[in-house]
Amino acid sequence: MDKISDAVSEALEKAFELAQSAKNPYVSENHFLKCLLENTESLFYLIIKDIHNNPKLLTSAVDEALSLEPSVIEGSAMPKPSPGLQSLLLDAKQEAKDLGDEYLSGDHVLLAFWKSNKEPFASWKKTVKISLDDLKKLIINIRRGNRMDSPSAENNLRGLEKYCKNLTLLAKEGKLDPVIGRDEEIRRTVQVLSRRTKNNPMLIGEPGVGKTAIAEGLALRIVQGDIPESLKGKQLYVLDMGALIAGAKYRGEFEERLKSVLKDVESVDGESILFIDEVHTLVGAGATDGAMDAANLLKPALARGTLHCIGATTLNEYQKYIEKDAALERRFQPIFVTEPSLEDAVFILRGLREKYEIFHGVRITEGALNAAVLLSYRYIPDRFLPDKAIDLIDEAASLIRMQIGSLPLPIDEKERELAALIVKQEAIKREKAPSYQEEAAAMQQSIEQLKEELAALRLRWDEEKKLITGLKEKKNSLENMKFSEEEAERVADYNRVAELRYSLIPALEEEIREDEEALNQRDNRLLQEEVDERLIAQVVANWTGIPIQKMLEGEAEKLLVLEESLEERVVGQPFAISAVSDSIRAARVGLSDPQRPLGVFLFLGPTGVGKTELAKALADLLFNKEEAMVRFDMTEYMEKHSVSKLIGSPPGYVGYEEGGSLSEALRRRPYSVVLFDEIEKADKEVFNILLQIFDEGILTDSKKRKVNCKNALFIMTSNIGSQELADYCAKKGSRVSKETVLSVVAPTLKKYFSPEFINRIDDILPFVPLNTEDIVKIVGIQMRRVAQRLLERRVTLTWDDSVILYLSEQGYDSSFGARPLKRLIQQKVVTLLSKALLKGDIKSDTSIELTMSKDVLLFKKIEG
């Protein structure tokens, strides 16, 4: 028998394997029946399931019959088909012939079983009380005019059920989230669906704005009956592309599956609507070696109006795939779905709040909803509302839920303290001296007291957990009751509606209110079950690295004394330190301009006066590590084409996919200090890029992605006018002001930088040449760093004033600033100490002092 469907052929093969493994000499019709029932995707199984909702009853009867089959002890010869199985297959072949089918399939086998009266099938058949004529009608209804003309034809029946999800059924079962707002878009979708031809809306919008939610909203309205007469009673299916492609082994199998779905939608005469999410994936799908792609299968049905279809795709994909295919584009009516306003996004979150509260078992405050929208809008610019705000609420709620299930911090601390005391007591008990025994007895009292405190805390924890868990269960019950009320109203069961609306629901709501009040009135609660704006800010900070949560007292104090902290590292530059500190304080309390970077500063001055050091010190203070500073040496950007290094190569060039060094650094770490060293050496094209960043806080990279630069601090350093500045300061001494210094360098500045560039800089900060006092302070800072490194080897280093004076005199050169000091300390001090350490002259746990003797550095050990 050569023309058998794939499903029947597979069942026959498995039947032979089953008989062989059970050592049965013959493959009976029961082996075959068992294997047919195991394939839950087969036509045979689907019809059995339609006849009787529980096919397991038949499976159990077949298993019992198989246990009575004879078996042979020796020999493993291949079992032969029994006369009963051969007769059954011949009958099935005749059924296929009668129905005009080319291939024998599962429905033919079922008809043959039905007529054979073989046990245990015959006994099961009596329980279902269905006639042969009714069975044939059911098969015709399932097949919907399809012929078995290929081995896989059987698999393509009921395409809608296999490869689609019924959204209206999910809405009826209450499994969809409520769709708030978007009334205009849903109304427009309904309007297009009501047309006679080309009734296919295409939802186009950015990812996360709510395109899929519009389809779900339509399904909810169909169930509620809030829909025009032309769409009442329709079924909305969403195409599952994964299921459609998965397991399509042979060429043309994917197209067959899609055709079966389209045929099912068309055969019900407009009663089904197909929703294709990410519709652009159909363009090109299945097209190999000149074959048609899946989109071409859609076109005829779309043009005729026999296929009701809703598509959804993003603006970029629509442009890239759909617009290129003019024939496909004109068969859809575009509906643009824009990002909701901040007010609408808050409104949407209010509608979803209850679902998330019930799922996580927490309370979400109004402030949390507002914070989620505002903070996501400001700090997560590369995603869209309401999706990003919903994600914030979801993550914050899951954080609280996780904390409820974990051990509270006070209990954890007490348990650690108790464990440490017990270990210490056990160690003391081993000592024989009476004083130790007394101490062990005293510790026992502390242990008992801690155990009592722990027991009380655990009792409180259990009570709070019980209250919170009970609240979650009651809220779940309330949601189920409200769904039951809606369902009863749909089927006009008004007695049930009245009972739920006026009795059960109000009583449960009152219980929930009482439980919430009882929970709120508890003092010193161990568990937090409220999602507030503080927690939302914490989640945003975790996502972006931008510290927008409320400042701790320690951080506030640190910001107030920022100048003092910076002056410990950068000496003699009060103008720059003061201006930068003010900018950071304004940004940290949220008073800086939200549409511009935190600060844009140009540091002017001769080499070695602390320009780069100040940028490093800022990064260290803000992020606790100097490496957090993103540094660009602008001598690498002197050619016109080098701008592509910053924002990425244009399309078609090597490195296009990698992105630019500046754009990628700011995308990964938006809150950072960006240093452009020696900015005057950069090409003019680089300055044009910086204009956009400094003015709007936005950088557009080579892929047209907008990178947020509003949380970065930009510092540029330059040596422009350093000679004029040095001459002026030498003439005037310490009596210079910032304004007078800038007036000296202004003419030189205008030669290098355009007026529009200078205009976008927040402040131009002159770094004046260092005087003798500054050099002495810098030597002290550098020496303390050497001493710090020695402390790691348990060596204490001190020095007298003569060492500082010698180093400051020998190491300072007004032309080179403080940089030669570092080299001198390396040559004179570090070299001397490293040789002494290698020789063993300096050992661990010693103190040494550096002194001068006839212009020679010496060290001596300090006894004691």
Curated annotation (Swiss-Prot):
Residues binding ATP 1: G205, E206, P207, G208, V209, G210, K211, T212
One GO process term, biological-process aspect: cellular response to heat
InterPro entries assigned to the protein according to its UniProt record, in alphabetical order: AAA+_ATPase, ATPase_AAA_core, Clp_ATPase_C, Clp_N_dom_sf, Clp_R_dom, ClpA/B, ClpA/B_CS1, ClpA/B_CS2
Clp R domain boundaries: 1-145
Chain spans, region Linker: 340-545
Repeat 1: annotated segments: 4-69
Keywords of the record: ATP-binding, Chaperone, Coiled coil, Cytoplasm, Nucleotide-binding, Repeat, Stress response
Pfam families: AAA, AAA_2, AAA_lid_9, Clp_N, ClpB_D2-small
Coiled coil: 390-524
Region (Repeat 2): 81-145
Subcellular location: Cytoplasm
Signal peptide: none
Chain residues that bind ATP 2: G605, P606, T607, G608, V609, G610, K611, T612
Gene3D superfamilies linked: 1.10.8.60, Clp, N-terminal domain, P-loop containing nucleotide triphosphate hydrolases
Keyword set includes ATP-binding: yes
Region described as NBD2: spans on this chain: 555-769
Superkingdom of source: Bacteria
Quaternary structure and partners: Homohexamer. The oligomerization is ATP-dependent.
Domain note: The Clp repeat (R) domain probably functions as a substrate-discriminating domain, recruiting aggregated proteins to the ClpB hexamer and/or stabilizing bound proteins. The NBD2 domain is responsible for oligomerization, whereas the NBD1 domain stabilizes the hexamer probably in an ATP-dependent manner. The movement of the coiled-coil domain is essential for ClpB ability to rescue proteins from an aggregated state, probably by pulling apart large aggregated proteins, which are bound between the coiled-coils motifs of adjacent ClpB subunits in the functional hexamer.
Recorded family membership: Belongs to the ClpA/ClpB family.
Entries under PANTHER family matching the protein: ATP-DEPENDENT CLP PROTEASE, HEAT SHOCK PROTEIN 104
Full protein name: Chaperone protein ClpB
Native organism: Chlamydia caviae (strain ATCC VR-813 / DSM 19441 / 03DC25 / GPIC) (Chlamydophila caviae)
